[in-house]
Amino acid sequence: MILEQYGITSFFKEQKIAATSSYGRVTAVFRDYYRVITENEEFLASLKRGNFYELSSTSLPTVGDFVEISGDLQILSVLERKTVFSRMNKDSAEQLIAANFDYALIVMSLNHDFNLNRLERYLTVAWDSGATPIIILTKADLVEDLSFYAQQLEAVAYGVPAYYVDNLSHHGFEALESDLKPNSTLILLGSSGVGKSSFINSLAGTDLMKTAGIREDDSKGKHTTTHREMHLLSNGWIVIDTPGMREFGVGFNQAGLETTFSDVEELAEGCRFHDCSHTQEPNCAVQAALEDGTLTMQHYENWLKLQREMAYHARKNSPALARQERDRWKVIQKSMRTHFKTRPKK
């Protein structure tokens, strides 16, 4: 069955649709149309007028969604999602990127793109999506000593598998492919030019995606993916490619943040006060870890930054939280200024 190759499972087939309708999966999103594949054909579909009028933008179809298709090839409804990846735009509105993927592959290159702060941000949204995160480090052939990067990953990516790959020699792909479940859906996340298109070609074993070279002046790749699209590989995996995202806003669900920064969250449980701001309160376990070097300042400050960003989006979407959050962060900021002024220099 075609849809089984495209990842449909009993979770979706058990969701009831009309007898005259059929199941489909969205393989690409364009401005006014969606490319959908069913058991019989692949086509461009539009939304059924009126069915989505009063729904929020997050209820609209996105790449990876399983949908109900009418006899005249219109999308009637979106089936319940298992996983979903979204980001917050500049207006604090949630923007859907993709849905129903099993693995979130965070692709970074071992050149100027390698950035732990960005990695922590990607890990936060990956955990929050409900999928299993995997770190892919491309251009491993350019690095003589990988231990430097391995040590940095250990500091922020707790228990997340990392694979060092070379798209030219195919080094590292055998280990990755043996760990991926067959017929699973993968989403690729990463900045422009990190080698996502080349990675897909290596995974597919053919030149499926257009690629571009690296600019010699800054080691940055050229952007090649312009829209979200799904690809069925001959080896059975389904890959969702996304345009490069160097910066994006995280939402206001704490689950992903708590998993990414599980070490800080565990430390916070040892604080004397349950409402500790982790800046200068007595018997603060987080500050104690900073003092003895157990917790790095970079990791701690990134945690605070993402906490504040989530609080910002939360109060933008829930005005009742605005005053409470402003008052809370005024106290935190004042405490931080006092703490860092009085903290002895090492």
Curated annotation (Swiss-Prot):
Pfam families for the chain: RsgA_GTPase
List of residues binding GTP: T138, K139, A140, D141, G190, S191, S192, G193, V194, G195, K196, S197, S198
Enzyme Commission number: 3.6.1.-
GO terms under biological process: ribosomal small subunit biogenesis
Cofactor note: Binds 1 zinc ion per subunit.
Residues reported in the UniProt entry to bind Zn(2+): C271, C276, H278, C284
Keyword Membrane part of the UniProt annotation: no
Gene3D superfamilies recorded: P-loop containing nucleotide triphosphate hydrolases, Probable gtpase engc, domain 3
Gene Ontology molecular function terms on file: GTP binding; GTPase activity; metal ion binding; rRNA binding
GO cellular component, one term: cytoplasm
Subcellular location as annotated: Cytoplasm
Enzyme class, first EC level, given as a word: hydrolase
Stretches assigned to the CP-type G domain: 93-248
Cofactors: Zn(2+)
PROSITE patterns: ENGC_GTPASE, G_CP
Keyword annotations of the record: Cytoplasm, GTP-binding, Hydrolase, Metal-binding, Nucleotide-binding, Ribosome biogenesis, RNA-binding, rRNA-binding, Zinc
Family matches, as NCBIfam families: ribosome small subunit-dependent GTPase A (TIGR00157)
Function statement: One of several proteins that assist in the late maturation steps of the functional core of the 30S ribosomal subunit. Helps release RbfA from mature subunits. May play a role in the assembly of ribosomal proteins into the subunit. Circularly permuted GTPase that catalyzes slow GTP hydrolysis, GTPase activity is stimulated by the 30S ribosomal subunit.
Subunit note: Monomer. Associates with 30S ribosomal subunit, binds 16S rRNA.
Protein family (similarity comment): Belongs to the TRAFAC class YlqF/YawG GTPase family. RsgA subfamily.
Protein's UniProt name: Small ribosomal subunit biogenesis GTPase RsgA 1
Organism: Listeria monocytogenes serovar 1/2a (strain ATCC BAA-679 / EGD-e)
Gene of this entry: rsgA1
